[in-house]
Amino acid sequence: MHLSSPALPIGGFSYSQGLEAAIELGLVHDEASTLAWIESQLVTVMARAEAPLWCLLFEAWRAGDDAAAHGWNQWFHASRETRELRQETEQMGRSLARLAQELGWGTAATRAAVAALRPATLPAVHACACAMWALPREAGLGAYVFSWLENQVAAAIKGVPLGQMAGQRMLERLRAGLPAVLADARARAGATPPRLDTFAPQYALVSARHETQFSRLFRS
């Protein structure tokens, strides 16, 4: 619960992951189009790449395989196609790593392994924190994906803008699809080799457009 809290001081509230640019371009303009956008990102970006990668990172940390964890951390960083997306995961990963250090999560050796990540990405540090706490993989993965969903909905409420009830309706709809998304992520992570798919050209294009957008509330 702690790791999925919107009060976690890692700056998630300041990012929209391209949603603000989609609003500016008219791709997102009301509750229905917002729901369609977030659902699309959930199944084409999160379920196919970031969530299964989180599983691989979690298993590496739990097995004490620092080399594998560092390798998947670098893979994720390289897969971020725009400067804003790279800066986002770097900043949030760095902030979560600092929190883990200051609160003394896990062992000194594990904290040192996290500190050695160059750069630390959010899924790598989040997966390590869950492994430090000996959380079940399903619980940690669910917390990671749901916190992403909440952040997307919160960004839409501010950016479209939408009302609070619209946000809750969207969360209810999106939450109903989470079991299938998590199952897909686990299956992709368990394949040999892992079936990671980062093909999301529209996501990359709107993120790139956001870098030069005239008026912005969010950092991505």
Curated annotation (Swiss-Prot):
Record's subcellular location: Cytoplasm
The answer to whether keyword Chaperone applies is yes
- Which Cys-Cys disulfides exist here? none
Where would one find coiled-coil regions in this protein? none
Superkingdom is Bacteria
What keywords are annotated for this sequence in UniProt? Chaperone, Cytoplasm, Nickel insertion
Query: Keyword Nucleus, does the record have it?
Result: no
Q: Which GO terms describe its molecular function?
A: nickel cation binding
Under InterPro entries, the record lists: UreF, UreF_sf
Q: Which GO cellular component does the record give, naming just one?
A: cytoplasm
For this protein, the record's Pfam families field holds: UreF
Main function: Required for maturation of urease via the functional incorporation of the urease nickel metallocenter.
| Membership in a protein family | Belongs to the UreF family.
Q: How does it assemble?
A: UreD, UreF and UreG form a complex that acts as a GTP-hydrolysis-dependent molecular chaperone, activating the urease apoprotein by helping to assemble the nickel containing metallocenter of UreC. The UreE protein probably delivers the nickel.
Task: Name it.
Answer: Urease accessory protein UreF
Recorded source organism is Bordetella parapertussis (strain 12822 / ATCC BAA-587 / NCTC 13253)
